[in-house]
Regions:
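Conserved segment of winged-helix/HTH DNA-binding domains
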Residues: 66-96
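Short capping segments at the starts of secondary-structure elements
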Residues: 15-17, 26-30
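DNA major-groove recognition helix of helix-turn-helix
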Residues: 49
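Short coil turns linking two alpha-helices in DNA-binding domains
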Residues: 27, 41-46
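Short alpha-helical segments that sit at the start of domains
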Residues: 1-18
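A short acidic, leucine-rich amphipathic alpha-helix
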Residues: 20, 33-39, 52
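Short beta-strand "wing" residues that participate in macromolecule-binding interfaces
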Residues: 60
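Glycine-centered, phosphate/nucleic-acid-interacting loop/turn motifs that mediate DNA/RNA or nucleotide
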Residues: 56
Length: 96
């Protein structure tokens, strides 16, 4: 999975993004579930999920709930990141 180093570093400095990552590290979740668990606004949760997905840290899958509704569930793509300082600046790569 390719990650965007600048986006990852910016997201890791954001409290809500870190809280979303922490919640998703336990198990995949829908945006409404994250919103309730983190006591954040709908806009905040969706913004962070979109940013995390664009950065290559989160992906979505559609799941069917027991009541028949289709719901997007978000899950972490990586469980470990490596930072390296080199001649080309800061590099961020998924762990192996």
């Amino acid at each position: 999975t390719a990650v965007d180093p600048d986006a990852v570093l910016e997201l890791l400095s954001d409290e809500y993004a870190r809280r979303v990552i922490d919640a998703l590290s336990d198990r995949p979740a829908s945006a409404p579930t994250l919103r309730n668990a983190l006591s954040a606004s709908r806009a905040t949760i969706y913004r962070r999920l979109n940013e995390l997905e664009a950065a290559g840290l989160v992906e979505t899958a559609v799941a069917v709930d027991p009541d028949g509704h289709h719901r997007k569930r978000y899950h972490l793509v990586v469980d470990e990141l490596h930072l390296r300082l080199g001649d080309n600046g800061i590099e961020v790569a998924p762990g192996e």
